């Protein structure tokens, strides 16, 4: 903005150079329009406004902020797993995806007491996060449930007209727990519905549910990541913490208290790798454990020497030197170690070089 005082000067100059006045005024109007957004001040102001609004929402309405981000996926730098882990670290309750309660999108549920204060509503995960569940099937499920609550898994499959693929996706994600119990019972019930002849679709199932052992904590976490891309159980690194403590690994939270220049080692899930074109070959790696995030700087020479560990690790240990500038903490990597085998069959995803 602020270009109006230059209008007459520009028009007169263009006329002296052989352009007619109408064309000169048209050019000025185009420049005027560009001036509304095209100069550093305008860019800075608009970006600062977005940052301020986002920061305010994250600080004062974290449940609603995260809910909106989850419903906008896929987008941005942070995955659903990172978003939900951050929300849990801020002690906002998150409720699981549940065919008996969840909408297609994530929603908020008021679990606040009458005491007021800064309590947040709970975030209810939506069926949209269930991998393999079609949107059409999920929306039919929600519509059928609004008409009448589901009596059992067979009733759900029948009235929502879900195919075997959709039902298996719900069972694998633990979204049938309110009707069947744990995942193994849900998968058994779904298999029974699939085997039911069409003639007997509406007949009640009198067969007793078998006594199947519940999955272990680790098995549930593996299934969570496979079916939802996130877990509401313990963070995978938390299951390894006792072992990591014996290796004298710091947590992300503990790193923040260490002094500048301290040698440190940390292990976390790799959530992102970035190598900006302006960074002279430096790679930035983000690690996550049960206490937070760790920003790691890998210089070019180390990246070239340990390319395999840098690019292929899902669980990475970094030995390095802490660099602190005020509240900002980085770990300058000196050595990398691939710890992915400790995850077993757990498969995680990272956002790399976007």
Language model segments and positions:
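Noncatalytic, beta-rich nucleic-acid-contacting surfaces in large DNA/RNA-processing enzymes
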Residues: 1-354
């Amino acid at each position: 903005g602020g270009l109006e005082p230059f209008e007459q000067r520009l028009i007169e100059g263009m006329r002296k150079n052989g352009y007619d006045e109408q064309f000169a005024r048209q050019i000025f109007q185009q420049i005027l329009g560009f001036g509304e957004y095209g100069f550093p001040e305008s860019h800075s102001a608009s970006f600062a406004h977005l940052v301020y609004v986002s920061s305010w929402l994250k600080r004062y309405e974290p449940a609603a902020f995260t809910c909106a981000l989850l419903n906008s996926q896929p987008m941005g730098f942070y995955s659903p797993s990172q978003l939900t882990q951050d929300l849990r670290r801020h002690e906002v309750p998150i409720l699981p995806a549940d065919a008996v309660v969840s909408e297609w999108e994530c929603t908020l549920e008021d679990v606040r007491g009458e005491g007021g204060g800064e309590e947040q509503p709970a975030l209810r995960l939506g069926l949209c996060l269930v991998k393999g569940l079609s949107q059409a099937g999920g929306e039919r499920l929600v519509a059928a449930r609004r008409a009448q609550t589901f009596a059992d898994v067979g009733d759900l499959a029948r009235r929502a007209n879900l195919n075997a693929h959709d039902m298996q996706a719900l069972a694998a994600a633990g979204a049938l727990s309110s009707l069947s119990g744990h995942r193994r019972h849900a998968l058994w019930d779904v298999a029974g519905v699939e085997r039911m002849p069409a003639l007997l679709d509406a007949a009640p199932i009198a067969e007793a549910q078998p006594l199947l052992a519940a999955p272990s904590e680790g098995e549930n976490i593996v299934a969570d990541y496979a079916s939802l891309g996130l877990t509401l159980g313990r963070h995978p690194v938390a299951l390894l913490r006792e072992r990591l403590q014996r290796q004298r690994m710091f947590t992300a939270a503990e790193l923040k208290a260490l002094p500048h220049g301290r040698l440190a080692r940390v292990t976390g899930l790799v959530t992102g790798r970035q190598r900006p074109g302006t960074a002279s070959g430096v790679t930035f790696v983000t690690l996550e454990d049960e206490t937070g995030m760790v920003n790691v700087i890998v210089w070019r020479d180390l990246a070239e020497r340990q390319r395999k560990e840098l690019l292929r690790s899902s669980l990475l240990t970094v030995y390095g030197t802490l660099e602190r500038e005020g509240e900002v903490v980085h770990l300058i990597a000196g050595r990398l170690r691939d710890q992915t085998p400790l995850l077993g069959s757990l498969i995680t995803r990272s956002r790399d070089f976007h």
